[in-house]
Design a protein with these regions (language model features):
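Periplasmic-binding protein-like
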Residues: 75-80, 128-130, 186-193
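Conserved beta-alpha
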Residues: 96-161, 241-242
Length: 245
């Protein structure tokens, strides 16, 4: 048997995601360097609408779901839901991550924390935020980013209420939406939502807009790799992965 035919698994990343999410694990498996695996576990979401109520329910049920995910013996966990992990405000995202770490014994980062760390890593101060969401969630995300030290130049959403519609928006549509709706000068563009195919559009947006673009899944992947101490290049990872630590 040729041992070289077997992939050596260096580390596992556990993804804790809402039950409606079909994009995050696909993105991780597409972009993770060889030797790293992603394993997802879903938090059942009783409502198929993207509202504060539905995100609060995901947050409330995340602890028990994380304990199940821990059975994969993941080396790190990502709580992959932007809208849920901002709900406790600036700094609350880290508290959420710590609660999950304490419950599982596995280092955990939330998408909200990953986004803040990514924007700071890029030295972004003025951030344009574009999302699939309605304004109810957009305003909460704006407040979170502003309280985290950023000037949010705009918070523009596609006004999608039904969660199952969000992953149906293709990367070409996302590219055109961001390009057409970006109004004010900014240091970076943040495209929110882990169930949104924004990472696929990222290289084209960075090339055309001339500023770094951060997406929820890209930032989450970057933060997970940092937790693992991995410095492997990520093809298609964008400016975030190119900036030295």
């Amino acid at each position: 048997v040729n041992a070289g035919a077997f992939e050596v698994i260096r580390a596992r990343i556990g993804l804790l995601i809402p039950s409606v999410n079909v994009v995050m694990e696909t993105d991780f498996r597409r972009y993770l360097p060889p030797g790293l695996q992603a394993h997802a576990h879903r938090v059942y979401r009783r409502s198929l609408q993207s509202t504060h109520e539905s995100e609060n329910q995901v947050l409330a049920d995340s602890l028990e779901a994380a304990k199940a995910l821990a059975h994969t013996r993941a080396d790190v966990i990502v709580f992959g839901c932007t809208a849920a992990t901002i709900l406790e405000g600036a700094g609350g995202d880290r508290i959420i991550g710590q609660r999950l770490t304490d419950a599982t014994g596995i280092p955990t980062v939330t998408t909200a924390t990953a986004v803040v760390e990514a924007l700071r890593h890029l030295n972004a101060r003025r951030v344009a935020m574009l999302t699939p969401y309605r304004d109810e969630i957009n305003e909460t995300e704006r407040e979170f980013l502003q309280a985290s030290g950023f000037e949010v130049t705009q918070a523009t959403g596609m006004q999608i209420l039904e969660s199952l519609r969000i992953p149906q928006v293709g990367p070409g549509q996302i590219y055109r939406f961001v390009r057409d709706e970006l109004k004010e000068p900014c240091d970076a563009v943040f495209i929110s939502c882990t169930n949104f195919r924004a990472w696929e559009a990222l290289p084209y947006l960075e090339a055309d807009l001339g500023v770094p673009v951060v997406t929820s899944n890209q930032a989450s992947c970057w933060a997970a790799l940092r937790l693992l101490g991995e410095s492997c290049p990520v093809r298609g990872g964008g400016r975030l992965f190119e900036e030295p630590a």
